């Protein structure tokens, strides 16, 4: 494999899990065989990576003897293999659509392992959640009324959380302000078919400080609910645990050195995901629990004293290092004396950050199909998909390849399991949907593919 950089000294090589690095360095011919058989782009998934990530988070919580509930945010990708890995490792699933719920049920999840989030649940979604007694996060007073209306007269108690919209999130359409939470509690006071289990929030961004502030607001509402005669036992902090895609120092150097001319658009994107996070998800969670909550108590101390379960729905954080996306190069086209465009078999719908006016700030890895007989000059290029859309660009960054790519070579993007590999995938131009497989090692440690479908995983 060949790593490259955008500017000498300011490249962004991805952090690679050993299994991924071994596939690229030791089993290159196997990778080409898989691409030949299954097409490009090809999404490869490692369920054991999710289990490792889950164990790291659970370790932080069990070390503090905190009651907890971790639900894998299934919306992060479409992999049943990762959903099954979460279930087999003791986690639950966060389902945000009727179809995610049905997949979870087909994988064997009962209602006790499911939480349903999202603001726009349909009556059909509500009904199937009620039928399996899944935990439902209620987004608004309007949703609460719809839910109550849909409950059978002889229904057992339906467990719910009320979704809080913290004060500093006033422009968000998700959740409800504290006074609306209290209004919902008053509505529930005479409704025996619904059990109020606690509060839920999910914030944009990755700052611990905003979570602590939201926890303080939630604590006040937990106290108010108990004064009203309820027995809440959970605070759910949603997701947003950061992960590390690239080395922090390299990332800072890259951001400091980038200039508008480094992009084919002549413009630096306004924002990026924090690819060079200083903390792993487990470290971030550790620091959140140690943060001061109130009256000199830490978050962990507050939860323990109040007898509260800490729930969360990590998506990206559990899918960290769990997938790669493999593109095959179809053509390298010269645009001028020192610039090229590299066309791949596939589209930016399978590496979709440019559709959000940003960039996936991880350098792709070039895996040559054959060894060049002569040393080819470096190539400066951006990456484009195979569609007729001018916007179908995988990377607007000018990338400098010290070894010139050729048709038939592979470009591998690492760590695409979180809202990247299949978030926008489709059959544009009637191309088939990209294939997705789980990578499982045999007894000799050799990687093998298993279809990433329900019934196979």
Curated annotation (Swiss-Prot):
GO terms for biological process, alphabetical: lysine biosynthetic process via diaminopimelate
Give this protein's Gene Ontology molecular function annotations.
diaminopimelate decarboxylase activity
**SUPFAM superfamilies on file:** Alanine racemase C-terminal domain-like, PLP-binding barrel
* Gene3D superfamilies, alphabetized: Alanine racemase (3.20.20.10), Lyase, Ornithine Decarboxylase, Chain A, domain 1 (2.40.37.10)
Q: Name one Pfam family in it.
A: Orn_Arg_deC_N
* Keyword terms of this UniProt record: Plasmid, Pyridoxal phosphate
- Going by the entry's taxonomy, the superkingdom of the source organism is recorded as Bacteria
Q: Which residues carry this modification: N6-(pyridoxal phosphate)lysine?
A: 75
Cofactor(s) the protein requires to work: pyridoxal 5'-phosphate
Protein name listed in UniProt: Uncharacterized protein y4yA
Organism of provenance? Sinorhizobium fredii (strain NBRC 101917 / NGR234)
């Amino acid at each position: 494999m060949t790593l490259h950089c955008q500017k000498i000294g300011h490249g962004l090589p991805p952090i690679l899990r050993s299994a991924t690095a071994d596939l690229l360095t030791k089993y290159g011919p196997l990778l080409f065989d898989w691409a030949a058989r299954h097409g490009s782009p090809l999404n490869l998934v490692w369920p054991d990576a999710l289990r490792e990530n889950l164990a790291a988070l659970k370790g932080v919580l069990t070390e503090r003897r905190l009651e907890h509930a971790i639900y894998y945010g299934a919306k992060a990708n479409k992999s049943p293999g990762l959903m099954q890995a979460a279930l087999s490792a003791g986690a639950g699933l966060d389902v945000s659509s009727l179809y995610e719920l049905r997949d979870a049920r087909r994988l064997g999840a009962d209602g006790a392992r499911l939480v349903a989030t999202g603001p726009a649940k349909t009556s059909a979604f509500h009904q199937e959640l009620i039928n399996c007694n899944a935990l439902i996060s209620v987004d608004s007073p309007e949703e609460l009324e719809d839910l109550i209306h849909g409950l059978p007269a002889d229904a057992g108690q339906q467990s719910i959380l009320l979704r809080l919209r913290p004060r500093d999130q006033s422009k968000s359409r998700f959740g409800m302000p504290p006074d609306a939470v209290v209004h919902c509690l008053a509505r529930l006071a005479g409704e025996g078919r619904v059990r109020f289990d606690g509060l839920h929030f999910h914030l944009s961004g990755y700052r611990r400080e905003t979570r602590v502030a939201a926890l303080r607001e939630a604590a006040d509402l937990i106290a108010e609910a108990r004064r009203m005669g309820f027995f809440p036992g959970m605070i759910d902090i949603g997701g947003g645990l950061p992960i590390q895609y690239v080395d922090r120092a390299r990332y800072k150097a890259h951001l400091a050195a980038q200039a508008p001319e480094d992009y084919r658009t002549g413009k630096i994107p306004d924002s990026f995901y924090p690819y060079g996070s200083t903390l792993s998800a487990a470290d971030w969670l550790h620091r959140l629990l140690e943060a001061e909550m109130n009256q000199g108590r830490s978050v962990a101390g507050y939860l323990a004293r109040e007898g509260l379960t800490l729930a969360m729905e990590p998506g990206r954080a559990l899918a960290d290092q769990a997938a790669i996306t493999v593109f095959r190069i179809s053509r390298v086209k010269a645009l001028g004396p020192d610039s090229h465009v590299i066309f791949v078999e596939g589209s930016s719908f399978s590496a979709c950050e440019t559709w959000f006016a940003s960039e996936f700030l991880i350098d792709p890895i070039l895996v040559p199909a054959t060894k060049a007989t002569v040393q080819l000059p470096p190539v400066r290029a951006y990456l484009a998909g195979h569609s007729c859309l001018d916007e179908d660009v995988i990377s607007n960054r000018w990338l400098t390849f010290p070894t010139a790519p050729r048709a038939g070579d592979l470009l591998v993007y690492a760590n695409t399991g979180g809202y990247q590999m299949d978030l926008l995938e489709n059959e544009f131009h009637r191309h088939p949907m990209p294939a997705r497989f789980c990578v499982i090692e045999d007894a000799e440690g050799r990687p093998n593919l298993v279809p990433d479908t329900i019934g196979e995983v």
